[in-house]
Regions:
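Intrinsically disordered, low-complexity regulatory regions
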Residues: 3-171
Length: 171
């Protein structure tokens, strides 16, 4: 179904936004410039850091050179493939590998590219959503917050060293 040039996926994506949650309007309208009143109500793309866009572009370049640019818009993608890739890139970054040793592309940029491909494929109606059946994980996370507080109280007098990447290699 199409409506005003949008696919059902676009309409559903907009409907999925949380009701009543709008970004704060920290803009100021100036009477002297009529464009301010209109422009300040548009999507604030300037909020996306240019550094992130630039680094993510390297991940998209890698993909374009390997598979062809925008290939997912034609061939389609399965969500699980990109979710797996995001998990692998995050695990590598979390464990100290900032960039892929073969390509030099930032793992975090690859995570961003994967997420953007999923969103774009969904927008274009080319996403096969093969995520597992829904589970109440959000409710579980909220419920476990009580356990976090209980554990923090239980161990409040313990002050072990909290190791980070700056502590060196394990032996």
């Amino acid at each position: 179904m199409k409506h005003a040039g949008f696919t059902r996926a676009v309409i559903e994506a907009y409907q999925m936004r949380a009701d009543g949650h709008t970004p704060p309007d920290n803009t100021v309208d100036k009477d002297t410039n009529p464009k301010d009143a209109i422009g300040s109500k548009k999507l604030p793309l300037h909020l996306v850091p240019s550094s992130g866009i630039a680094m993510t572009a390297t991940a998209f370049l890698e993909g374009a050179l390997k598979y062809g640019k925008y290939n997912w818009r034609i061939a389609g993608v399965r969500a699980s493939i990109y979710l797996d890739a995001m998990h692998r890139h995050i695990a590598k970054w979390e464990n100290g590998e900032d960039v892929d040793p073969e390509t030099g592309v930032s793992h975090l940029a690859s995570v961003c590219a994967c997420a953007m491909i999923i969103m774009d494929a969904r927008l274009c109606g080319k996403l096969t959503d093969d995520r597992p059946p829904r589970a109440s994980v959000a409710d579980l996370i909220n419920l476990l917050a009580d356990d976090v507080q209980r554990l923090q109280v239980r161990f409040k007098d313990h002050h072990p060293h909290q190791y980070t990447i700056h502590d060196g290699e394990l032996t």
